[in-house]
Design a protein with these regions (language model features):
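Alpha-helical segment proximal to the catalytic Tyr-Lys
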Residues: 144, 187-188
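C-terminal helical subdomain
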Residues: 191, 198, 215-283
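Residue(s) in the substrate-gating loop at a strand-loop-helix junction
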Residues: 158
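Active-site helix of classical SDR
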Residues: 139, 174
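Active-site loop immediately N-terminal to the catalytic Tyr-X3-Lys motif
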Residues: 117, 163-169, 191
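Conserved glycine-rich cofactor-binding loop
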Residues: 32-34
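Substrate-binding pocket helix/loop in short-chain dehydrogenase/reductase
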Residues: 115-116, 123-125
Length: 285
């Protein structure tokens, strides 16, 4: 059972591998808005070198300005992740330009609300390409950069990938796929210095698929209030520092961030397993 906020215990028998990310390269997709922007800006503040992507140049530059404004280092790539050729260009650029890639955060996602009766093939295929196919092949091509010294792969999931929701068939299928991909890759890389985990952001965090303009429009028709994704920064910082030992888990970002606030970031393997929503058997044994 996951631990609740405010519960701390200190069994120090088992440790896991971590490495500071200060001065190291981290790739965050979908960093032009929402959760992706919050993750990138927080990691920039703690000294990571950021590679960030978005399909919208104006939004991406806003994120980059925030990172540079706090003294951070960032490279931007405007990219349509549904394009195989553009995805290949991104992996080429990272391979050629990264001195030490330590974390891949597959965050970019699109969400089109359509019932099965009304779903169109092009919409279905685009959702799967951005939300699932791109993370799989981006990770495949960049894993060799992590292999020697280790690293962390963080796949952004959703409650839609755990529960399923009406009128979100393509999105839910893609997020269930992300959960399966995370578990399969964790098993394949078991025993290495590479951690593979998924994260559900929580309902209070504005989805990356919702633009800043959408937020303004929604505020006139709903009482929905989103929290600043920066509050999740400590959770993603901790996960980005992992180098094996914690893998095949699904974390709720808000729960993990609250636990870190209560207990600090020097957590044991048992504590992280206890706070995880799901732990894949056999990976860390």
């Amino acid at each position: 059972m996951p631990m609740q906020s405010g519960q701390c215990w200190g069994d120090q028998r088992v440790k896991y591998l971590t490495e500071p990310i200060e001065g190291m390269d981290v790739l965050v997709t979908g960093a032009g808005r929402g959760l992706g922007r919050g993750i990138a800006c927080f990691l920039g503040q703690v000294g990571a070198h950021l590679w960030i992507t978005s399909e919208v140049e104006e939004e991406l530059e806003k994120t980059a300005e925030n990172i540079r404004g706090s003294g951070g280092w960032v490279k931007t790539r405007v990219i349509d992740l549904a394009s195989e050729s553009q995805l290949s260009m991104l992996t080429r650029d990272v391979k050629q330009g990264s001195s030490r890639l330590v974390a891949i955060i597959n965050n970019a996602a699109v969400l089109e609300r359509q019932s099965l009766q009304h779903i169109q093939r092009d919409s279905w295929e685009h959702t799967l390409q951005v939300n699932l196919t791109a993370p799989v092949f981006l990770t495949r091509d960049l894993v060799p950069l992590l292999s020697d010294e280790g690293g962390s792969i963080i796949n952004i999931s959703s409650r839609a990938g755990v529960l399923g929701f009406a009128d979100q068939t393509a999105y839910c299928a893609s997020k269930f796929g992300i959960e399966a991909f995370t578990r399969c890759l964790a098993l394949e890389l078991s025993g290495s210095k590479i951690s593979v985990n998924s994260v559900t952001p929580g309902l209070k965090i504005k989805p990356t698929s919702i633009t800043d303009a959408d937020v303004v429009a929604l505020q006139s028709t709903t009482s929905q209030a989103w929290s600043d994704p920066a509050i999740l920064g400590p959770a993603f910082h901790l996960l980005a520092c992992l180098r094996g030992g914690i893998s095949g888990c699904r974390f709720d970002a808000i729960t993990l961030a609250n636990y870190i606030a209560d207990c600090g970031s020097e957590l044991t393997l048992e504590q992280l397993h206890a706070v995880a929503e799901y732990v894949l058997p056999g990976v860390d044994e």
